[in-house]
Amino acid sequence: MKKLTILFLLISIFSCAQKAELKKEISKITERKKATVAVSVLGIDFPFQYNNNNAEKKLPMQSVFKYHIALAVLDLVDQGKLSLDQKVFIKKSELLPNTWSPIREKNPEGNFEMSISELIEYSVAMSDNVGCDVLLRLIGGPKVVHDFLISKGAKDTQIVYNEELMQSAWKNQYENYTTMK
């Protein structure tokens, strides 16, 4: 609940902030950094873009794609196809050894159940790679998330790989991308 409150607080701050002040703050944070920065905040009354030079640049999402996975899962919950209380069985073989996973640390022997709401929390709030891949398995894979995003009007966004495959080759991270458009 605390995390949800913080999220809504951040959304409120963004929606109330002045665009010029926000650009100034972003510039202050990013100046002198060797980084490609593109920020986009979309809202009914608050469209905002920073650094239009990078607007069309395909940026790897890396762990940010876990948010998109959560959206696709929650859409299936809204449709009544899944339930947040629904338990999902996690096999020991899914607890990949060389990846970040608080789930694996908590349950090293595998073969246990977690609710969808717990998997979302671990995936989004703790960036758990195992939880992410379990959610993707549950809903049918990265293509389901990609198709969901396209159906909601997302443009210039692509999700091809789960965490396991994204980490198997350096170049794969660039196939899960988005732009600020």
Label the model's feature ranges.
Residues 1-21:
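Bacterial Sec-dependent N-terminal signal peptides
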Residues 17-60:
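Beta-lactamase-like hydrolase cores
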Residues 59-88:
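Active-site SXXK
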Residues 66-76, 119-145:
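Alpha-helical scaffold elements that line and support the substrate/ligand-binding pocket
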